Amino acid sequence: MDLTQVLPEKLLADVLRRVAPRGLAACRCACKALLGIIDARRLLRTDLLPHSVAGIFINFHSEGLPEFFARPSTGPTISGRFDYLPPHIGDSQYRGKIEDHCNGLLLLEDYFENYYVVNPATRQWNSLPPHPSMSKSGEIDADFTYQEYLIFDPTVSPHYQVLPPALDELDTVMEESEWPPSVCALHVFSSSSGRWEERSFIRDGEAADTIADMRRHFDKHYAVYCRGALYMHCITDFIMRFSLSNDKCQVIKPPIHGELGECPKLHLGQSEKGVYLASICEMSRLLVWVLDESCGQTNWVLKHNSCIPPILDYDRPILGPWVLQDINYEYLKERKDHTDTEDMKYLKEKKLQLNSSKEVLVEEKIEWDSQNDNILHKEDVVDAHGNGYFDILGFHPYKEIVFLDVSMYRGLAYHLKDSKVQDLGYLYPTTSHLAVLNEYFITESFPYTPC
């Protein structure tokens, strides 16, 4: 039934005002009449979308399941357990990692290279069909890192896309071939068609490097979907901008090397003013740049350059306003073959130490106040340089806040505008007490915004 022919436009608009943003996006795609009503009355306004950060999903190298670091909730719980996904072979539980996040959807990969797109807020999920060969020969060069990225904007469409790096047309035998090639041929997955489709992007401007310079680098490189384009952080720190409206790609050079100094790695993210890059140099100096694309030019503007104060007692197991769900510990505790082992007894002791302040914590307010909660004052920091090291977990997408961890023990929220530091809480997984030291590190982290 065509509701636009049955109901008066004003009445239909009143009905549509009660529809959630993602549902409105679906209505826009249903027919031109609904599209006209929604757009003419500005019913789908991005400023009315939820702008909250529900928590941070974290992949720890030593753990089989992602962890979720978040404020405890009295409502439906968002979890990193993903026990509704197909279980690991020989197990009762899904096991894998999070590859990407975009506007409330997660891209997951299990240990058999099966991919899933998941909405943790609704527990809805879809599996992706196998990816076509990334090379014409059907063989994949082991020296390249293949990461796939998610594209989703609920204000535009209920459908998502998955975009891999531009690798399909590379001749990896030709070490001096330019990277990226003049035509980037990709297989892009579209949820509207349910299949991988060939798509070519024409390079606008010069190449960034040669294939010889693009060999494997194990650090995670993130991507950002912003203003209708995907910004992909590539090896050697240049950014590739894929415009989905005109099928063009462009190389964006990183900040000049003089500014980078001894910065070990850059972290790409999205925040209040668009696309950001951040790096921590000399263990505690935080540098942040914002991408300026005005007047048809691209330029990195240095936004912040300041030292983060060392944190006092950063490794003490004391809970804060945010709590790690400790999914790997709960999973291990449920396994019958681990119930009475010495390792399990040891982990239970560690868990008891951490839970000593939990009852008081749950009684506090649930909504995180990004301005006032758990501000660290002078007595909470130390003067000595090097008391723990800092790493970047991601950006708050709507406020100029960088999420950090201190030696993987505590989470912090660092405000760029006034250098205010908030203690979020203890994020060390209980099961990591059993990990070999060189196996314990964070591989990926994603601030999560539900939709």
Indicate where each model-derived feature is located:
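N-terminal entry/capping and adjacent linker segments that precede and initiate structured domains
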Residues: 1-451
